[in-house]
Amino acid sequence: MTNYPQLNTEINGNEIKLIMHTNKGDMTFKLLPDVAPKTVENFVTHAKNGYYNGVTFHRVINDFMVQGGDPTATGMGGESIYGEPFEDEFSKEAFNIYGALSMANAGPHTNGSQFFIVQMNEVPESMLSQLADGGWPEPIVKAYAETGGTPWLDQKHTVFGQLIEGKDTLEDIANTKVGPQDKPLHDITIDSIEIVE
């Protein structure tokens, strides 16, 4: 039986628990190194080194996603720990369901430091039937139906974690007022990211 680690809130096996402290509150995630080892190593190393401290969520689209991780706050910046953009790590076990922690990119194999958290509350009915027909696993289609998500990003953006606590904070961030280019009018910042060993 295939394991879909995003469908439970326990920290199992190699999974890593982290708390993202923001000026809107905390969000707790579990990271999935078995699914996306290189991506998780990149994120955890950046977090431990304070790379994300003080960095904003520079792009917020309510009922879609909130994006951060760019020290320049332009959407053009950020880099990986590897010194160059690194490859996508797609999996048949991880999907862009509501609360997924996923890598932003500028096309295939262009991962750096930017990430987004999926915040779409409802997947249209017509899309759900397409998922079932398109080979998405039944438990994942069910999760999309019950909690929402962005299935069209599956196999296009690397999913490497899942929100397990702090939905209110995510919704609060998503509901902020934005200006041009979906940039919040008032900075929403990551104060720090704590790895819970």
UniProtKB/Swiss-Prot annotation:
Homology family: Belongs to the cyclophilin-type PPIase family.
GO molecular function, one term: peptidyl-prolyl cis-trans isomerase activity
InterPro entries: Cyclophilin-like_dom_sf, Cyclophilin-type_PPIase, Cyclophilin-type_PPIase_CS, Cyclophilin-type_PPIase_dom, Cyclophilin_A-like
Organism, scientific name: Staphylococcus saprophyticus subsp. saprophyticus (strain ATCC 15305 / DSM 20229 / NCIMB 8711 / NCTC 7292 / S-41)
Entry keyword annotation includes Isomerase: yes
Domain PPIase cyclophilin-type: 14-195
Keywords: Isomerase, Rotamase
Function field: PPIases accelerate the folding of proteins. It catalyzes the cis-trans isomerization of proline imidic peptide bonds in oligopeptides.
Catalytic activity of the protein: [protein]-peptidylproline (omega=180) = [protein]-peptidylproline (omega=0)
EC number(s) given by UniProt: 5.2.1.8
A biological process from GO: protein folding
Protein name: Putative peptidyl-prolyl cis-trans isomerase
Record-linked SUPFAM superfamilies: Cyclophilin-like
Pfam families linked to this entry: Pro_isomerase
